[in-house]
A protein has these predicted regions:
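N-terminal, polar/charged subdomain of small-to-medium soluble alpha/beta proteins
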Residues: 1-60
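Long, highly charged amphipathic alpha-helices
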Residues: 12-16, 20, 77-81, 125, ...
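Residue-level signal for inorganic ion chemistry
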Residues: 17, 67, 93, 183
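A generic structural signal for short beta-strands and their flanking turns/coil linkers
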Residues: 29, 47-49, 86-92, 109-113, ...
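Short loop/turn motifs enriched for small/polar and acidic residues
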Residues: 34-38, 96-98, 155-157
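Flexible, gly/pro- and Lys/Arg-enriched active-site loops
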Residues: 57, 102-109, 121-127, 131-209
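Short, surface-exposed acidic-centric catalytic microdomains
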Residues: 77, 81-122
Length: 209
C-alpha cells in the first residue's frame, strides 16, 4: 500500500493505511497505528516525528420512511445507496411496514423500516451521506412532519450519546415511536438504549401498554 501511494502528511499515511487494513482484512474490527518519520523537516530540534491513530468499524441503525411516490421502490433504492457509500456496508434490513402518519395526520400512510450498517464514517459524515441520498430521492424539507419521498435518520451509532445543532444520537423520542421500534425490534431486539438502559424489546413493550 505504501509503495503504491504518495502522501505529504503523516496523518494521511496513517489514516489511509488504517482504512486499507480495515476494508481488506476480513474480520478486522479495530486498528491502532503509529508511524514515525526520522529527521522530519518540521523546523524543530526533533530526531523523530510520529503520528498515532486508532480506527474501527462502527455500527449504526438507520430508520427509513416514505409516503410519497412508489415508497417501496424508494426505500429499496435507499438501502442500495447506503450500501454503496464508501467504507460502509449494510448488514441487516427489516421488513417494510405500513404505519399511520405521525404528527401531521392528514397525509398518506408511511412505509417504514430499519437497517443495520457497519461504517468507518463518523456520525457527521454519515449524516451528510444520508442527506445526500434523501436529496437525490427528491426530499424537500417544507412541512415539519409532512409528506416526504424519503426520510433517513440515525437511530443509534454504537453506544454514542451526542447532541449537536445537526443531530442527536440516540434519535430524540425514538422510544415513543412504534414506526421506529417495530422494524428495529425485528433486526435488533436486544440492542440497549445507552441513556434509558432498556432494550428495543423492552421499549416496544412499554409503548404497547
Amino acid at each position: 500500500y505504501l509503495k503504491s501511494h504518495t502522501f505529504k502528511l503523516l496523518e494521511k499515511v496513517a489514516e489511509g493505511l488504517a482504512e486499507e487494513m480495515l476494508v481488506r482484512i476480513a474480520g478486522l474490527q479495530k486498528v491502532q497505528i503509529e508511524i514515525k518519520k526520522p529527521w522530519a523537516p518540521v523546523g524543530l530540534p526533533l530526531k523523530t516525528v510520529s503520528v498515532e491513530i486508532e480506527r474501527e468499524w462502527h455500527t449504526a441503525y438507520i430508520a427509513l420512511g416514505s409516503n410519497m411516490g412508489d415508497s417501496r421502490s424508494i426505500l429499496e433504492a435507499a438501502v442500495q445507496a447506503l450500501d454503496e457509500i464508501k467504507n460502509t456496508k449494510v448488514e441487516k434490513v427489516s421488513t417494510f411496514i405500513t404505519t399511520p402518519p405521525y404528527g401531521v395526520t392528514d397525509q398518506p400512510d408511511f412505509l417504514n423500516g430499519c437497517l443495520k450498517l457497519s461504517t468507518l464514517l463518523y456520525p457527521e459524515e454519515l449524516l451528510k451521506e444520508l442527506n445526500r441520498i434523501e436529496k437525490e430521492a427528491g426530499r424537500e424539507r417544507i412541512i415539519h412532519w409532512g409528506p416526504r419521498t424519503l426520510d433517513l435518520d440515525i437511530i443509534f451509532y454504537d453506544d454514542l450519546v451526542a447532541e449537536t445543532d445537526a443531530l442527536c444520537i440516540p434519535h430524540v423520542e425514538m422510544h415513543k415511536r412504534a414506526f421506529v421500534l417495530e422494524p428495529l425490534h425485528e433486526i435488533a431486539p436486544y440492542k440497549r438504549h445507552p441513556v434509558y438502559g432498556k432494550t428495543v424489546r423492552e421499549m416496544l413493550e412499554d409503548l404497547r401498554k
